[in-house]
Amino acid sequence: MEAAQTIAPEWRPIPLHGRQLAYAARSDTGRVRSSNEDSLELDLETGLMVLADGMGGCNGGEIASAMAVNIVAGEFRQFPLTLPPDEVSAGLSSAAMRLCTAIAKANREIYQQGLIQPQLSGMGTTLVAALFVGARVTIASIGDSRVYRLRQGHFEQLTVDHTVVQEQVEYGLITPEQARLAGNRGLITRALGVEAGVEVDVQEQPMLPGDVFLLCSDGLFDMLDDTEIQFVIDHAGGDLETAAQHLIEAANYKGGYDNISVILARAA
């Protein structure tokens, strides 16, 4: 089993009209898989956090997820998002557009790599990204990795899973409780790099002091329900690194059937 990857928490400025952000990240292979196909990228200079959960044979999952986070983060490092202080609204809209453009580039390059190398054909990845800009966070999602927010005791899933069972829930065919136990709950309807184009869900959320954002792969929430995840965060004494470590440990204790990755960020 590979050792868990850890990024220590610290305070860093968020770009543009900035606040401060504490963060921690951790990724673990789990107790069953032989390799880790999840990838993480945090760039506190640009305010971007990205998490991807790859899929595909011949190491295709590892390649796809690594390409996704590197390309998206690289776009913001190469072309930093800069706007005058009096253009906050325009900046948020531009942030969302920039994020979509970067994700579209990642999709194209992963897809093209699959065409060039037949053994990687069909590889793809989920992706969730959070771009912190001033008093707002722009969130993008594809697949079944998730973004949650903990605000004043209320723990809420902000993203919608792109899965067959989620569609069944929306059509009233099954309940959310049944969806959690469904054998096909990991069957996704949307992924990055599988087709020449991809639809990305994008939203912009206000950020309040004390808000905690969690980006995670399905290796976490397939093992722990939302109540258990919140319990771990609440009982970490405000220490994000402790919370990240305990989330990984709890998911492994419950079975650790998949790779487990988490990014936690708290606004000051």
Give the predicted meaning of each segment.
Residues M1-A268:
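PP2C/PPM-type serine/threonine phosphatase catalytic domain
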